[in-house]
């Protein structure tokens, strides 16, 4: 257990040390201030504005900003859909991969445009290098930038007084990609290449096995095909942008995507780096760092508790494992605990940390198979997604989702003391409350409706590899992942079918854009308001009491929404294992 504590402490320390300066840097980018990269990138930025006829002085209303977000996303979806369909005719396809089915193309286009990266296929066998690079990798950049841009708009809504505009979407997305995502991705890509992650355009290589194996039918296998490709560049942004879609089917459990313990560290820190940094950006730009720290602490407390629960449950294992008497013991030669579905080179601590990080953020990349976790160890990642991906969450969307919960929290507090609620010096009125409820409830609606329909359809039930509580957990996890814009999976059933592809695709669209539009509506309403002077009756939103209230509201909504479903899935499985 000491190993768990030390590793957890190290990961969090590195994360915070890197996130604070990055948060200040991102704050400067939002405000258009000069940074150390300005001399290099400003000419590129101005060139983009010129060729696209972008008016740098335009300040958009929330409705125009929303229209721009939707228009950009729709165009991205159409282009990515067509890339999937026609990839067999496009270049950089050394393995001669044909186009995908229309329903898989529909699902995957939505998946990457919404920053979910749910994958019902294996990339190395289903997609060409061109589709991976020009389709998926491009969307990894711009879908992440869309989320950050919407957060910028919301922050402006709080800091501006009696205005109409909340910024310019085209400027926000351009600056986010140019100044934040590309530089960070270059650094992480080079770090990954140094550890052996592949980055080339070669054909797949056939190599001889060190130990030939005999299949059940008696066939002797002496060779294996090793997939190659431009993986490192895609992996870097899949982590930094909380995208999560793997170049390979097994994601970062694959030794070509994640070969060493150092590559694992780089990828895991990258996963939460920007979501954590944005908390400090928020505090800096509203000119009250305590507000950003309060939200960071609330998120951090929930993250650490989740890490502890997953780590302890995976180290202890199941009651059946405990009959061994030794399986939970960690020694210098073995990780102990529940090692099913985990890479021996990573062990319990690193695998459980990644599982917690990737579901706290709306990332979804994996270095172990969540379906093989213990019932409670698998339930916590599911619950983190069901809370609305607000425990840091995706880049931009996690923080604006948590701000939605903060608005609910101050409203509840205002009801208790009989005052009009205020947040960051502005009154919270009925319109903001309606939009905040929309932001907070979109995820539960998408998850529960989708999983409920799928669970009663014979084609889903018949395709399950596991029956009973665990089978239901697999379906619930799939729609939780889609509704949380996460993208990870328990797997365990046929995911690449027309119904699953379409229904999960619709869940991803709903869960991405409904909260986003609600957030922009809040920004548009707030930007018109004047600041209200603090008084003795004003609820402080930066102290321990508010942090506790915020955590309570997040958990209350999550518990009320999902406890019945969790009781039928992982909780029932836990008690079944107890005998």
From Swiss-Prot:
One of its GO terms (cellular component) is plasma membrane. The keyword Cytoplasm does not apply. InterPro entries: KdpA (IPR004623). Signal peptide: none annotated. Keywords: Cell membrane, Ion transport, Membrane, Potassium, Potassium transport, Transmembrane, Transmembrane helix, Transport. The chain crosses the membrane at residues 2-22, 66-86, 135-155, 177-197, 260-280, 292-312, 391-411, 437-457, 490-510, 546-566. Coiled coil: none annotated. This is Potassium-transporting ATPase potassium-binding subunit. It comes from Clostridium botulinum (strain Eklund 17B / Type B). The lineage of its organism: Bacteria, Bacillati, Bacillota, Clostridia, Eubacteriales. The gene is kdpA.
């Amino acid at each position: 257990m000491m190993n768990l504590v030390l590793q957890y402490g190290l990961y969090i320390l590195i994360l915070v040390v890197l996130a604070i300066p990055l948060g200040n840097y991102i704050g400067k980018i939002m405000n258009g201030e000069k940074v150390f990269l300005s001399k290099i990138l400003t000419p590129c930025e101005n060139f983009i504005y010129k060729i696209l006829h972008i008016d740098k002085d335009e300040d958009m209303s929330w409705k125009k900003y929303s229209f721009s977000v939707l228009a950009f996303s729709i165009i991205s979806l159409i282009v990515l859909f067509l890339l999937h369909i026609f990839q067999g005719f496009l270049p950089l396809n050394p393995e001669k991969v044909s186009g995908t089915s229309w329903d898989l193309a529909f699902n995957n286009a939505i998946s990457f445009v919404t920053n979910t990266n749910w994958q019902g296929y294996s990339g190395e066998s289903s997609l060409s290098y061109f589709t991976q690079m020009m389709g998926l990798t491009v969307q990894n950049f711009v879908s992440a930038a869309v989320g950050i841009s919407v957060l910028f708009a919301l922050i402006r809504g709080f800091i501006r007084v009696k205005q109409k505009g909340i910024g310019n979407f085209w400027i926000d997305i351009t600056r986010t990609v140019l100044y934040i995502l590309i530089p960070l991705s270059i650094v992480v890509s080079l770090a990954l290449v140094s550890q052996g992650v592949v980055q080339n355009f070669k054909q797949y290589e056939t190599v001889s096995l060190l130990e030939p194996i005999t299949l059940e039918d008696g066939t002797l296998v002496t060779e294996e095909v090793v997939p190659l490709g431009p993986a490192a560049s895609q992996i870097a942004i899949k982590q930094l942008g909380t995208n999560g879609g793997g170049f390979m089917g097994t994601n970062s459990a694959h030794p070509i995507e994640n070969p060493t313990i150092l590559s694992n560290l780089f990828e895991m820190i990258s996963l939460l780096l920007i979501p954590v940094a944005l908390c400090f950006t928020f505090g800096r730009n509203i000119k009250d760092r305590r507000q950003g720290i309060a939200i960071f602490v609330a998120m951090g407390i929930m993250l650490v508790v989740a890490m502890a629960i997953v780590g302890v449950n995976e180290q202890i294992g199941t009651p059946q494992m405990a009959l061994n008497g030794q399986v939970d013991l960690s020694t210098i030669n073995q990780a102990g605990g529940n090692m099913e579905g985990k890479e021996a080179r990573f062990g319990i601590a690193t695998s459980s940390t990644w599982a917690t990080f990737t579901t706290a953020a709306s990332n979804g990349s994996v270095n172990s198979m969540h379906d093989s976790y213990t019932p409670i160890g698998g339930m916590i990642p599911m619950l983190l997604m069901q809370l609305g991906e607000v425990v840091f969450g995706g880049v931009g969307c996690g923080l604006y989702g948590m701000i939605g919960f903060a608005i609910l929290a101050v409203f509840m507090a205002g009801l208790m003391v009989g005052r009009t609620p205020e947040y960051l010096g502005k009154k919270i009125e009925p319109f903001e409350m309606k939009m905040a409820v929309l932001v907070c409830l979109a995820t539960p609606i998408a998850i529960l409706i989708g999983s409920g329909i799928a669970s009663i359809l014979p084609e889903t039930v018949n395709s399950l590899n596991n029956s009973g509580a665990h089978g239901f957990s697999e379906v619930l996890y799939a729609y939780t992942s889609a509704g949380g814009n996460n993208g990870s999976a328990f797997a365990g059933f046929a995911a690449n079918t027309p119904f699953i592809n379409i229904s999960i695709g619709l869940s991803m669209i709903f869960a991405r854009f409904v909260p986003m539009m609600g957030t922009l509506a809040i920004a548009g309403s707030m930007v018109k308001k004047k600041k209200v002077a603090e008084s003795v009756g004003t609820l402080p939103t930066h102290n321990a009491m508010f942090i506790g209230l915020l955590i309570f509201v997040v958990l209350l909504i999550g518990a009320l929404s999902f406890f019945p479903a969790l009781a039928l899935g992982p909780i029932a499985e836990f008690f079944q294992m107890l005998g």
